Amino acid sequence: LLASSAASDVYKRQLEERTPKKVLVLDLDNTLWGGLAGETDHTPVLLSEDHSGLAYKNLQRVIKLMQEQGVLLAIASKNNEEDAMEILEHHPHMLLGPEDFAARRINWDPKPDNIRKMAEELNLGTDSFVFFDDSEAEREMVRQMLPEVTVPDFPARPEELAPCMAKIYEEYFARAVITKEDREKTAQYRANAGRNAMAEQAVSFEDYVKKLEICLIPVDP
């Protein structure tokens, strides 16, 4: 028991001394689910409670827990956005919905470019990002073009996905203390990104305030 307590204290000190990563960037096809979006309708992709789809659902369970511990989730997927969103919004076994992601880039642009844009949107450095993708070519491109981004290896078998993600959490994201603010980070960053987007579109300060639906009350001098 004493040895276990001492080991726990050492681990806690290690967590306190390091700077945890903040954003987990996820691919979709053959990563968050098995198969390819858009090939048929939204049900045949591998994501279920049976053997063929359970590995991907277990992965989503781990990622959902990470999000609840304050990890920001983002999507970088080469896909038709409509097909991908159909699965995210309507697949009966999806545990992660659009509202769980602080930023999304579902298009055909290079993934390093999309990661840069999401970093700007979230106002975070790319050195706080971890990129998880089944494609070796995509992983290598991010390593070459964004060497500050952490790019773990992808497991060889689907059943290794959930244990691999749990290890990624412990190695890069785990914190000594999780606060209420940490647990609400996704909503906070989504709101900030929305305000920033409105600010860019506004032609004047008054227009920006109007878009935010804020009432300004004059104060007498």
What is the predicted role of each segment?
Residues 89-221:
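C-terminal cap/substrate-recognition subdomain and adjoining C-terminal extension
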Residues 32-60:
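Active-site neighborhood of HAD-like aspartate-dependent phosphohydrolases
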Residues 1-7, 11:
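Single conserved hydrophobic/aromatic residue that forms the stacking wall/gate
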Residues 34-44, 78-95, 100:
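Metal-dependent catalytic core segments for phosphate chemistry
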Residues 19, 43-47, 68-69:
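Basic, amphipathic N-terminal segments
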Residues 22-36:
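Asp-based phosphoryl-transfer active-site loop
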Residues 54, 58-92, 104-105, 142, ...:
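Substrate-recognition element of Asp-dependent hydrolases with the DxDx(T/V) motif
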Residues 32-33, 55-62, 73-84, 111-118, ...:
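Extended, hydrophobic alpha-helical segments in both membrane/secreted and soluble proteins
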